[in-house]
Protein backbone atom coordinates (compact mmCIF):
# COMPACT_ATOMS: atom_id res chain seq x y z
CA UNK A 1 0.00 0.00 0.00
CA UNK A 2 1.38 3.45 -0.81
CA UNK A 3 2.21 5.27 2.39
CA UNK A 4 0.92 8.64 1.16
CA UNK A 5 -2.72 7.55 1.08
CA UNK A 6 -5.02 8.31 4.00
CA UNK A 7 -6.39 5.25 5.77
CA UNK A 8 -9.14 4.68 8.29
CA UNK A 9 -8.03 2.56 11.23
CA UNK A 10 -10.04 1.17 14.10
CA UNK A 11 -7.98 0.74 17.24
CA UNK A 12 -8.69 -1.51 20.19
CA UNK A 13 -7.44 0.05 23.41
CA UNK A 14 -6.95 -1.48 26.84
CA UNK A 15 -9.24 0.16 29.36
CA UNK A 16 -9.41 0.21 33.11
CA UNK A 17 -12.02 -1.71 35.04
CA UNK A 18 -13.80 -4.88 34.13
CA UNK A 19 -15.42 -5.85 30.89
CA UNK A 20 -18.73 -4.12 30.31
CA UNK A 21 -19.86 -5.23 26.85
CA UNK A 22 -21.98 -8.40 26.70
CA UNK A 23 -20.12 -9.76 23.66
CA UNK A 24 -16.64 -9.13 25.09
CA UNK A 25 -15.96 -6.23 22.72
CA UNK A 26 -14.13 -4.28 25.43
CA UNK A 27 -12.08 -7.09 27.03
CA UNK A 28 -8.65 -7.40 27.00
CA UNK A 29 2.74 -0.43 22.27
CA UNK A 30 3.82 2.36 19.95
CA UNK A 31 3.24 5.92 18.93
CA UNK A 32 1.12 6.14 15.79
CA UNK A 33 0.78 9.54 14.11
CA UNK A 34 -2.65 10.61 12.96
CA UNK A 35 -5.89 11.96 14.35
CA UNK A 36 -7.81 10.04 16.96
CA UNK A 37 -11.60 10.40 17.01
CA UNK A 38 -13.22 8.85 20.03
CA UNK A 39 -15.99 8.99 22.60
CA UNK A 40 -14.44 9.13 26.06
CA UNK A 41 -15.82 9.04 29.55
CA UNK A 42 -14.72 11.17 32.49
CA UNK A 43 -15.82 11.81 36.04
CA UNK A 44 -17.67 15.01 36.88
CA UNK A 45 -17.48 16.96 40.14
CA UNK A 46 -20.64 15.21 41.31
CA UNK A 47 -18.93 11.78 40.99
CA UNK A 48 -20.97 10.90 37.94
CA UNK A 49 -19.60 10.14 34.52
CA UNK A 50 -20.06 12.13 31.35
CA UNK A 51 -19.28 11.14 27.77
CA UNK A 52 -17.53 13.58 25.44
CA UNK A 53 -16.18 13.57 21.89
CA UNK A 54 -12.41 13.77 21.50
CA UNK A 55 -10.49 14.76 18.40
CA UNK A 56 -6.75 14.64 19.02
CA UNK A 57 -3.97 15.15 16.49
CA UNK A 58 -0.53 13.59 16.97
CA UNK A 59 0.29 10.33 18.68
CA UNK A 60 -2.80 8.15 18.91
CA UNK A 61 -1.41 5.30 20.97
CA UNK A 62 -3.37 6.21 24.11
CA UNK A 63 -0.23 6.32 26.29
CA UNK A 64 0.82 2.82 25.28
CA UNK A 65 -2.65 1.34 25.67
CA UNK A 66 -3.31 0.68 21.97
CA UNK A 67 -3.50 -3.11 21.73
CA UNK A 68 -4.16 -3.59 18.03
CA UNK A 69 -5.37 -1.66 15.04
CA UNK A 70 -7.24 -2.64 11.92
CA UNK A 71 -6.94 -0.96 8.54
CA UNK A 72 -10.55 -0.79 7.36
CA UNK A 73 -10.54 1.69 4.47
CA UNK A 74 -8.74 3.93 2.05
CA UNK A 75 -9.98 7.49 2.42
CA UNK A 76 -9.97 9.58 -0.77
CA UNK A 77 -12.11 12.31 0.86
CA UNK A 78 -10.68 12.89 4.36
CA UNK A 79 -12.53 16.18 4.91
CA UNK A 80 -15.92 14.52 4.38
CA UNK A 81 -14.95 11.64 6.70
CA UNK A 82 -13.90 14.12 9.39
CA UNK A 83 -17.22 15.95 9.00
CA UNK A 84 -19.16 12.71 9.52
CA UNK A 85 -17.10 11.68 12.57
CA UNK A 86 -17.65 15.06 14.19
CA UNK A 87 -21.41 14.59 13.78
CA UNK A 88 -21.62 11.21 15.55
CA UNK A 89 -23.27 12.00 18.88
CA UNK A 90 -22.15 10.97 22.32
CA UNK A 91 -25.08 9.75 24.37
CA UNK A 92 -25.46 10.58 28.03
CA UNK A 93 -27.32 8.34 30.45
CA UNK A 94 -28.09 5.55 28.00
CA UNK A 95 -27.46 2.21 29.76
CA UNK A 96 -24.83 0.12 27.99
CA UNK A 97 -23.71 2.95 25.70
CA UNK A 98 -19.94 3.43 25.52
CA UNK A 99 -17.06 4.13 23.14
CA UNK A 100 -17.62 0.82 21.34
CA UNK A 101 -21.20 1.86 20.58
CA UNK A 102 -19.85 5.19 19.31
CA UNK A 103 -17.46 3.43 16.88
CA UNK A 104 -20.29 1.19 15.68
CA UNK A 105 -22.50 4.19 14.98
CA UNK A 106 -19.63 6.06 13.32
CA UNK A 107 -18.94 3.16 10.95
CA UNK A 108 -22.63 2.82 10.16
CA UNK A 109 -22.90 6.54 9.32
CA UNK A 110 -19.79 6.36 7.13
CA UNK A 111 -21.17 3.32 5.31
CA UNK A 112 -24.57 5.00 4.86
CA UNK A 113 -22.93 8.03 3.26
CA UNK A 114 -21.59 5.77 0.54
CA UNK A 115 -19.06 8.16 -1.02
CA UNK A 116 -16.49 8.86 1.69
CA UNK A 117 -14.44 5.68 1.50
CA UNK A 118 -12.52 4.15 -1.34
CA UNK A 119 -11.64 0.47 -1.06
CA UNK A 120 -12.98 -0.60 2.31
CA UNK A 121 -14.25 -3.31 4.58
CA UNK A 122 -15.85 -1.32 7.35
CA UNK A 123 -19.00 -3.29 8.15
CA UNK A 124 -19.41 -3.31 11.92
CA UNK A 125 -19.65 -7.07 12.45
CA UNK A 126 -16.55 -7.69 10.32
CA UNK A 127 -14.61 -5.03 12.21
CA UNK A 128 -15.72 -6.19 15.66
CA UNK A 129 -15.21 -9.89 14.97
CA UNK A 130 -11.79 -9.33 13.42
CA UNK A 131 -10.64 -7.07 16.26
CA UNK A 132 -11.63 -9.64 18.88
CA UNK A 133 -10.07 -12.49 16.88
CA UNK A 134 -6.84 -10.53 16.37
CA UNK A 135 -6.46 -9.73 20.07
CA UNK A 136 -7.02 -13.41 20.91
CA UNK A 137 -4.40 -14.36 18.29
CA UNK A 138 -1.88 -12.01 19.90
CA UNK A 139 -2.41 -13.15 23.51
CA UNK A 140 -0.55 -16.50 23.25
CA UNK A 141 2.25 -14.66 21.44
CA UNK A 142 2.64 -12.61 24.67
CA UNK A 143 2.06 -9.38 22.78
CA UNK A 144 0.33 -7.67 25.72
CA UNK A 145 1.77 -9.18 28.91
CA UNK A 146 5.39 -8.03 28.67
CA UNK A 147 6.79 -11.55 28.26
CA UNK A 148 7.36 -11.26 24.51
CA UNK A 149 10.27 -9.51 22.82
CA UNK A 150 8.34 -6.79 20.96
CA UNK A 151 9.05 -3.18 20.12
CA UNK A 152 6.22 -1.31 21.85
CA UNK A 153 6.47 1.34 19.13
CA UNK A 154 5.09 -1.15 16.61
CA UNK A 155 1.38 -1.72 17.10
CA UNK A 156 0.06 -5.05 15.79
CA UNK A 157 -1.82 -4.13 12.62
CA UNK A 158 -4.19 -6.19 10.53
CA UNK A 159 -5.38 -5.09 7.09
CA UNK A 160 -9.04 -6.06 6.97
CA UNK A 161 -9.30 -5.24 3.25
CA UNK A 162 -6.51 -7.64 2.33
CA UNK A 163 -7.08 -10.14 5.17
CA UNK A 164 -3.46 -10.07 6.28
CA UNK A 165 -1.26 -8.89 9.09
CA UNK A 166 0.93 -5.94 8.13
CA UNK A 167 2.79 -5.54 11.43
CA UNK A 168 3.17 -8.26 14.04
Where are these regions (language model features)?
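Compositionally biased, low-complexity repeat tracts
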Residues: 7, 12-14, 20, 30, ...
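Residue-level marker of intrinsically disordered, low-complexity segments enriched
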Residues: 8, 30, 70, 114, ...
Amino acid sequence: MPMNKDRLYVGLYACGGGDRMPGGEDSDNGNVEGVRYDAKERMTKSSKTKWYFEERRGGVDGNGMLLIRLIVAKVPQPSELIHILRQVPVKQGLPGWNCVAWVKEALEKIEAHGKVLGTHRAEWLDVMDTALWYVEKKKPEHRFDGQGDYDINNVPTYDLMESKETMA
